């Protein structure tokens, strides 16, 4: 069917500054569902069969969560479904949804290990995939705009130590677009590749991403018309992986302790992580680790 814009709102004010509606079709209960931030840490769930008349069916309070709610159904590798309620800071809550109410234990989980990503949105009409894009809160000093959009990521469910966690991997289209710039041992960078062709299909963005699992030092420039130099080092004796942009260390991971340093901030993650994907684009570094269960920007 075709949607037509009408000249007035369809949902009266519930709370003074309620905002950020997200609407989706819930097939099992045969209705459109709207999630809405109401006030403070309160959210509402509304339903409608015609997008005109809406009924509030639930009101939820989530500690420290606010703005930009979303409610999505995710699957694990075996196809088991779980519903997830999402808020602007990347706080998420597991539960079950019947088209009317969201039943949850109220335990808050964090999708990101820092506070740069914000207000992520998922998209409709993506088949069985749940794809999310956040806004990145960067000052962009010296430029006439603030922030940037983050890498599109596909959401699914994973398990760590028996606990359910959110997996957010870069979308498969991105993975399919990568081009290798070094050999299997990573001892020799093929300079011709880095000078004569873009590392990714999107040459304008000058994006480079490679999985890191080597013992040797290598470095490259994105393209001859940029001044960005990336250097990645793995110190085998200390079991430390580090990445530098333009001679400034932006990323250090200690596999023995699980300590992860991003810029000036230090976080404690799992020890012994062996899979990392690092994406560099201009001044932005996006990291994905441990099969998509750890994300930092």
How would you describe each model-predicted region?
Residues 37-41, 86-87, 145-148:
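Short, solvent-exposed loop/turn segments at conserved positions within beta-propeller repeat blades
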Residues 42-44, 91:
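A short loop-to-beta-strand structural motif that recurs across blades of beta-propeller domains
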Residues 1-25, 36-37, 54-73, 103-120, ...:
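Surface loop/turn signatures of beta-propeller and other carbohydrate-active proteins
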Residues 100-115, 124-297:
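Beta-rich accessory regions
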């Amino acid at each position: 069917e075709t949607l037509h814009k009408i000249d007035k709102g369809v949902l009266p004010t519930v709370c003074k500054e309620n905002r950020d509606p997200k609407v989706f079709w819930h097939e099992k209960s045969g209705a459109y569902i709207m999630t809405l931030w109401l006030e403070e840490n309160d959210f509402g769930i509304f339903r409608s069969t015609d997008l005109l008349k809406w009924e509030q069916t639930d009101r939820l309070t989530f500690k420290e969560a606010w703005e930009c709610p979303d409610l999505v159904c995710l699957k694990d590798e075996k196809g088991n479904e779980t519903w997830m309620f999402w808020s602007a800071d990347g706080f998420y809550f597991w539960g079950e949804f019947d088209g009317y109410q969201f039943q949850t234990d109220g335990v808050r989980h964090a999708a990101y290990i820092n506070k740069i990503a914000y207000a992520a949105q998922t998209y409709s009409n993506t088949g069985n995939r749940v794809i999310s894009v956040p806004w990145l809160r960067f000052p962009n000093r010296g430029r006439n705009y603030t922030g940037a959009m983050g890498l599109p990521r596909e959401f699914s469910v994973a398990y760590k130590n028996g606990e359910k966690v959110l997996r957010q991997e870069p979308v498969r289209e991105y993975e399919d677009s990568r081009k290798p710039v070094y050999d299997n041992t990573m001892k020799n960078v093929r300079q011709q590749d880095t000078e004569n062709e873009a590392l990714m299909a999107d040459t304008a963005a000058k994006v480079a991403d490679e999985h890191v699992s080597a013992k040797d030092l290598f470095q490259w420039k994105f393209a001859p018309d940029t001044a960005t130099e990336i250097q990645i080092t793995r110190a085998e004796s200390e079991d430390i992986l580090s990445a530098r942009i333009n001679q400034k260390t932006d990323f250090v991971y200690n596999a023995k302790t699980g300590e992860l340093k991003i810029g000036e901030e230090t976080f404690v993650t799992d020890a012994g992580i062996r899979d990392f994907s690092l994406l560099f684009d201009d001044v932005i570094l996006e990291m994905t680790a441990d099969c998509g269960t750890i994300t930092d920007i």
